[in-house]
Amino acid sequence: MKRVLISGADGQLVTDIIKVLSTPENDMFFNVMAFNRKRLDVTHKEALEIEFEKNNPDFFIQGASYHVVEEINKNPKEACDVNIASLHYLTELCNKYNCTLINFSTNYVFSGLKPPPEDFQELDHYNEIDDPSPVNLYGILKYAGEQILSTSCEKYYNIRVSGLFGKTGSRAKNGSNFPYTIKKNLELSNSADHLEPVKVVADQIVNVGYTVDLAEVIVKMMRQEKQNLYGLYHLANKGECTWYEVAAKVAEVLGYGEDKITPIPTDEFYTNLKRPKDTSLNMWKVENRFDVEIPRWDDAIERFFKNEVL
């Protein structure tokens, strides 16, 4: 039985990973020890050393992250400690204990300015061999964390995710996420006091990731662990989309008309922080190496509301 040590256990992605690890088909293979940040602070090396010595894990899932883009510029020291210093500690400990480190990065390591493909055989979305070029501090810190793993960690999966949404919501956003926010704003816009449509950015191209779908893939990666499969992967629901398109899909699922969502440019919504325009990811590598099929984003939005919200 593989021992799995998890930090950031109350995060929306990690919550679903724990659920999948605990299903009857998986719990015979994994013994899970999960900690929220109050119980295990990954910025304290001594605390990590105690848990590694006590549990001798086969996997460490680094679910603790400082990822609210707007807040990072206000608290760069804390963001560096969580997103960079912790990975120095974890890499050292994982190497010492022959443990596989699972870390989560972001589509924001890219500038969003990838040139269009010259012919149909080339990949038009960002793939794992494209060079990162982050445009804000969040992307810079996450890319720095990636480099620690790629240069120093012996066994790791570094997984770039994008636009996460799940039942738990983001702890850093008080249990909210993009679909929840759109649902709330649609309800407000439908009230007598707020008849204006919901404004949503329409010129950023991304992927979104339903945490249930992503958790299923991550656990399959753990089940199929082999030396030649370690490395960097992109993981989100398939199909590029704009935030406006996601919001329109949420409105459709909830029974609202198209007129309830209004597209706006990024500059009208975000005035102080640069964001990349097109960070859509290619999932070919993870699908082919682990023989998985990732659902499309619009299907994921429908299932999210049907299974976990409505």
What are these regions (language model features)?
Residues T242-A248, I264-V309:
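Conserved C-terminal active-site "lid" loop/helix of NAD(P)H-dependent oxidoreductases
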Residues D81, A85-Y89, V109-I159, G163-G166, ...:
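Catalytic helix-loop patch of NAD(P)-dependent Rossmann-fold dehydrogenases
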Residues S7, F35, F60-A64, L101-N107, ...:
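SDR active-site strand-loop-helix element
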Residues K2-T23:
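N-terminal Rossmann NAD(P)H-binding glycine-rich loop of SDR-like oxidoreductase domains
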Residues E196, V217, Q224-Y270:
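Mid/C-terminal beta-alpha module of Rossmann-like enzyme folds, strongest
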Residues N31-L48:
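Adenosine-cofactor binding site in Rossmann-like domains, unifying the SAM/SAH pocket
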Residues K45-V82, L93:
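NAD(P)H-binding glycine-rich loop region in Rossmannoid oxidoreductase-like domains
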Residues Q147-V206, V212-D213, V219:
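NAD(P)-dependent short-chain dehydrogenase/reductase
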